[in-house]
Amino acid sequence: MYNNKLTIKPAIFLVAAFTLAMVSCQKKFDPKSYAPKQTFGGYAASNEVAASDLVAHFAFEGNLVDSVSNTAATNNGTSNSPGIKGQGMQVGEGNYAVFTPTDAIKNLQSMTIAYWVNTPINTKGIQTPVSFVNPDQFWGNMDMFFDGQASDKSVFKMHLFGNGGANEAWLAAWSIASPWDKWLHLALTYDMTSEKFAFYVNGTLVGTSTQAGFGAPNFATVPAIVMGTAQFQTNPTMTSATDHQDWASFVLGVMDELRIYKKALTADDVKALYNLENLGK
């Protein structure tokens, strides 16, 4: 009887040890490791979207470097701030950055420009995230700006010169509801074959505008791209056509993830870019 008890006790111990080992293994199992990657439009990361057509990308990760050309913009008072994806560029009153465009940008025909902005209302004047300088004209070769700013909405206007500067286009003044103090993804596409512009906010098409005879954007002679204000608000002004305007101001908030492509992204690609960057991917 004594010997039987001795035989049973080690057996019970072995069963208990095996059970504990199994439980331990089960606790370490992570079902997420088997889950497929989340994708949008077939992309798992924002850098995958139309990657071969990307001609400029400012991630603003502690610097003002375009990762495509590996050249930096000149800083005029901007600083680092939390962005939609990592760090962003804090602009603020009187501040901006200036980038000398590469040949890839100057030679654009069809194109997309997309970026994020998070800014409060500016009661002093228009806020211009991006301005492609035209040194001989009041307005730049491309201007994108918040105008008609109200507490619950803003008109967003876009102006461009095309066809060697012979044609000038003011796109429809689209209204954005509740645009302040939150991240907005803005994207403008242009297909030169159809001469059609499309404007997206947070991945959703807001409207289109066909400009007959517009041709290629007038970027061949653009000397600089201003990020954070209009070409005539820099110090000194970048155009001989005018000086500072009292109805114009600066982006007061943060910009992030500015990308320029040499094609008109599809609606699906714009949506994918918005979704992925919004998730920090």
Give a label for each model feature:
Residues 2-4, 21, 25-94, 271-281:
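Extracytoplasmic low-complexity segments
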Residues 35-49, 92-111, 170-176:
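Short surface loop/edge beta-strand patches of beta-sandwich-type extracellular domains
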Residues 55-63, 111-121, 239, 245-276:
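Extracellular, beta-strand-rich glycan-interacting domains
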Residues 115, 181-190, 199:
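Short tryptophan-centered beta-strand motifs in secreted/extracellular beta-sheet-rich domains
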Residues 159-185:
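Short, aromatic/His-centered strand-loop micro-motif at the edge of beta-sheets
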